[in-house]
């Protein structure tokens, strides 16, 4: 008797027709579980107040970001890992406390080349990655310690270029802040030899165009876009296309910031339109946040073409403090997530989350196994269920300050033992120091914070005295005199 192969029936003409029909109706099996595209949008010095959906101030206009929140998730307790640009970006991009890499502040840069970034983690899952806008993880004029260790008296291009995005896993890049960009593709999407490109147009529009150009050339994905808007950071600009007549009586710096934020919002809207046009909007996970809170500097309204280190016109309302502080206004920022059809729409999530969680969440979304080196957590199962995470503590160390948040409680330490304890859920403005009335809670969080600092480089609570800025800020925001530098 002729043997019949057990799979032969599927090759019957009618079976083949059915398989072909199913292929075109349902698509290939792999497509159902195709990893999502991932976009991380980081603004620069954007304060907690400055999205319309936050409901904190009346003058802000961000319709596209508000729509993103309504179609996704707004995290009301979103934190960065530092109240300053470079260390915050190092923590976000690696998913690890940046102090594990020896970075407490900007002078501790550059990001070590052996640090593993989100782009490098996603590469084994087939992702193509692009970095756009502000990088700020390379050596610069204040990284004196690194320069001394490497025998460098004055930085030259050959000292800096090895620390650009290509060295950290990015296949494509349009790196720059304002008028000059280091790029390996053009704004029409065509590849080019790596080199410097001058741009005369408004920086936010250029950075949006660079993101759109990359996405347009990679419609099949999966891709990872790390889009870093240099806004509303100083030096401020007030592009007429984004100014609104209703702002004319506001401080000049506030007007400029509002117009720059409107430009970011417009860019986010353009990205959404492009994703929809390419049929990618339901398979793209998007994060939106800031690198730290707004620098307020007493709200001094100097002309926008002066005082580059002053107030950037943004606001942290209703939070206490500003950029450079481990007060809420320095480290708590806008934090949105969207993944249409996957994450709930219109959710307000109140449990603390961190930019550390972006790497772990991206890892999980890409189908990669958990990495025990990551300090963040995968937010997807929590957000899908609307559940709080198992109790965890978030930590910070910056200048002479240390902080920890566990649940509703926050510990803050500055200098040699000035301590504060706040119930952040009840007191987001950090007005009521409960250190004296809650000694057990104070002791617990202090011990946790100290144990965490023992894992860092260098270990322990900061030993340096408060710097002149801290010596001004803590009396101003907390009503406590602290000793500054001798």
What are these regions (language model features)?
Residues 2-17:
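Bacterial N-terminal signal peptides that target proteins for export
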Residues 3, 28-31:
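Post-cleavage N-terminal segment of exported redox proteins
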Residues 423:
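Catalytic Cys-His active-site segments of thiol-dependent hydrolases/isopeptidases
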């Amino acid at each position: 008797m002729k043997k019949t192969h057990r799979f032969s029936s599927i090759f019957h003409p009618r079976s083949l027709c059915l398989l072909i029909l199913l292929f075109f109706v349902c698509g290939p099996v792999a497509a159902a579980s195709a990893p999502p595209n991932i976009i991380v949008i980081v603004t620069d010095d954007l304060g907690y107040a400055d999205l319309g959906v936050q409901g904190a101030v009346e003058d802000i206009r961000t319709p596209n970001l508000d729509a993103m929140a309504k179609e996704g998730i707004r995290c009301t307790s979103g934190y960065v890992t530092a109240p300053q640009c470079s260390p915050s970006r190092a923590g976000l991009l690696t998913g690890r406390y940046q102090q594990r890499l020896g970075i407490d502040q900007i002078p501790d840069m550059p990001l070590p080349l052996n640090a593993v970034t989100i782009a490098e983690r996603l590469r084994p899952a087939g992702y193509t990655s692009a970095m756009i806008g502000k990088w700020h993880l390379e050596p610069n004029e204040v990284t004196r310690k690194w320069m001394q260790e490497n025998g460098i008296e004055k930085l030259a291009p050959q000292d800096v270029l090895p620390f650009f995005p290509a060295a950290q896993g990015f296949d494509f890049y349009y790196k720059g802040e304002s008028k000059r960009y280091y790029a390996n593709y053009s704004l029409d999407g065509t590849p080019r030899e790596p080199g410097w490109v001058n741009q005369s147009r408004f920086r936010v529009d250029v950075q949006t165009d660079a993101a759109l150009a990359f996405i347009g050339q990679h419609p099949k994905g999966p891709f990872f876009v790390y889009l870093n808007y240099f806004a509303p950071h100083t030096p401020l600009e007030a592009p007429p296309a984004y100014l609104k007549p209703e702002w004319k009586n506001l401080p000049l710096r506030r007007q400029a910031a509002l117009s720059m934020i409107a430009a970011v919002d417009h860019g986010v809207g353009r990205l959404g339109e492009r994703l929809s046009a390419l049929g990618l909007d339901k398979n793209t996970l998007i994060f939106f946040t800031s690198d730290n809170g707004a620098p307020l500097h007493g709200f001094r309204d100097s002309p926008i073409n002066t005082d580059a280190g002053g107030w950037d016109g943004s606001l942290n309302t209703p939070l206490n403090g500003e950029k450079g502080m481990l007060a809420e206004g320095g480290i708590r920022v806008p934090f949105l997530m969207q993944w249409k059809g996957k994450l709930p729409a219109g959710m307000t999530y109140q449990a603390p989350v961190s930019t550390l969680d972006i790497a772990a969440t991206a890892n999980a979304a890409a189908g990669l196994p958990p990495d025990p080196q990551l300090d963040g957590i995968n937010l997807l199962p929590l957000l899908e269920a609307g559940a709080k995470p198992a109790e965890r503590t978030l930590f910070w160390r910056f200048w002479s300050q240390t902080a920890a948040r566990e649940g509703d409680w926050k510990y803050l330490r500055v200098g040699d033992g000035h301590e504060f304890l706040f119930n952040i859920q009840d007191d987001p403005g950090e007005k009521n120091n409960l250190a004296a009335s809650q000694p057990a809670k104070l002791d617990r969080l202090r011990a946790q914070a100290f144990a965490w600092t023992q894992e860092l480089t260098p270990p322990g609570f900061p030993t340096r005295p408060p710097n002149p800025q801290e010596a001004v800020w803590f009396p101003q925001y907390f009503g406590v005199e602290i000793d500054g530098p001798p």
